[in-house]
Amino acid sequence: MDKVMRMSSEKGVVIFTKSSCCLSYAVQVLFQDLGVNPKIHEIDKDPECREIEKALMRLGCSKPVPAVFIGGKLVGSTNEVMSMHLSSSLVPLVKPYLC
């Protein structure tokens, strides 16, 4: 869990993904379209992939990826991020991290 918390604080917006996950890609594109350059951690390329997945689940992710952190705090997965975007509450959160 310490590794995940450390990784989630490396940048203002951090996304844990898997390279083969289309939902992860969609979330990445959304943030890039908003003008944010998120830190991407492709956990399937990390030797500790299983431990990272378990830690993300313990933090409250219903699915391990994509897991989005803004300002070091877990926002959620695709559903939460898209809901925030549609309700116009995502942009104020990422405003400090715009490129």
From Swiss-Prot:
Instruction: List locations, semicolon-separated.
Output: Cytoplasm
Q: Which residues bind [2Fe-2S] cluster?
A: C21
Question: Which Pfam families does the protein's record reference?
Answer: Glutaredoxin
Cellular compartments per GO CC: cytoplasm; nucleus
GO MF annotation: an example = 2 iron, 2 sulfur cluster binding
Q: Which residues form a coiled coil?
A: none
The GO biological-process annotations, alphabetized, read as:
cellular response to nitrogen starvation
Residue span(s) of domain Glutaredoxin: 1-99
What role does it play?
May only reduce GSH-thiol disulfides, but not protein disulfides.
From the Swiss-Prot or TrEMBL record, give the protein name: Monothiol glutaredoxin-S11
Tell me which species this is from.
Answer: Arabidopsis thaliana
